[in-house]
Every structure is written in structure tokens, then in C-alpha cells.
Amino acid sequence: GGNITVQIGDEGILLVDTQYAPLSDKILAAIRAISPKPIYYIVDTHHHGDHTGGNANLRAAGTTVSGGNMAGAIRDSGIGAAIIAHENVLLRLSSDKTPQALPSGGWPTSTFFGSKKELFFNGEGIEIIHLPAAHTDGDSIVFFRRSDVISAGDVFVTTSYPFIDTASGGSYQGYVAALEKLDDIIIPVYGQDGGTLVIPGHGRISNLGDVLNYRE
């Protein structure tokens, strides 16, 4: 499955992606070994099952948000963590024409249409940035501003050459533009020796040099 990013702070826990459903118990156990805080948010970087398969399980293990620390209203999502994603992720996960569609319990409960959604959680500004027609038509990267960390989803991986899912709206031009957007955000000297840390969809934690090499 894909990498999962976990943000833990005084307010609670935010996850980026959820891997496959059969791994949910192990994932939750690993999180609980670090913190007993409630899971309030899950962010889907795109709709593929190795990143969203655990949505329903980890949502059910979470806690419903109360209060207004997110820009944009949350749909009536029942009990559990809020699942945030671009609208195209919801459209694909809820479509009977999508091979990797999920039951409704795994669908995003809060979606956005534009280029970005902003969240303030655990004392940190978080930007969820849509990258149109890249790996798919629903890709987002998640930028943790204070931590100087980007969770990149499958627009950047270290384990293979780029895969463009054209059947799901991906394109070569969009993929290149997504990598250029990553380059624009990454700061090579701030915070740590390698600058902004980039968590790929698959593979090891990386930095600007790795992203530039991948783009070439």
C-alpha cells in the first residue's frame, strides 16, 4: 500500500491516506502506540485503493469534528473522522463505473472544487492543494506549513517511474505541472539540511533534490 502521513498534536490526529482495508487494525495499533488522541481528519490524496481502502475503518475509529477550524462546511457525515478530498475523488469512489469504488462509509465527507482547501489543526496551517489531471483527476498534495512537510501522494514516488492513470483523468502535461508545483513549494534550506521533507506516495522520505531527479 501507499505511505500514510500522521500528524499528531494537542488537538488530535490527522491522517493522509489510509492504505488497504485489511491493514487497518495494524495501522491503528501503530498510531495508538504513539498517541491515544482521537483521529479527527483523514485526507485522501486521490481515489486509488492503496490510498483509500482503509477509509471506512479508520473513519469509524475516529471522532466527529465539533467546531469551526476548517474552511468549508462538512457534510452530515455521521459518527467518525471527517474525510477530506477533492470533489473528483468523491465522484470516483462513489461511482459504480470505478473499479476501486468504495461503500458509502469510505467516501469523502468534505470536498472542495477549487485549487486549494485550508485547515488549521494542531496549531498548524495545512494546505490541501489540488493538482489537476496529473496522476489522476483528483490528486492533492498536503502541505504542513509549520512542520515544512509535504505529503505528495502518487504525483511523486521513489519506487518506480511515474504512472499516469489516463482512464481516471490523468495526463502527462498535468503530471509535469504537478512536479513543478512541488518544486515551487519546496524550500531547500529551511528547517533541516535538505529543506522541506517530501513524503511520497510510495517509497522513502525525500527532499527537493529527489523531486528534481524524478522530474528529469
Which residues does each PLM region occupy?
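Conserved beta-strand hairpin/beta-sheet module of binuclear metal-dependent hydrolase folds
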Residues: 1-30, 140-144, 149-154
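Histidine-centered catalytic micro-motifs
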Residues: 43-50, 131-142, 199-203
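Active-site metal-binding motif and surrounding structural segment of the metallo-beta-lactamase
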Residues: 9-14, 21-81
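Residue-level marker for buried hydrophobic side chains located in beta-strands
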Residues: 14-16, 43, 83, 149-151, ...
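Active-site metal-binding loops of divalent metal-dependent hydrolases
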Residues: 18-19, 47, 88, 154-155, ...
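Divalent-metal (often Zn2+) His-rich catalytic cores of metallo-beta-lactamase-fold enzymes
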Residues: 149, 173-216
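Second-shell loop/turn segments in exported
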Residues: 13-20, 162-168, 205, 210-212
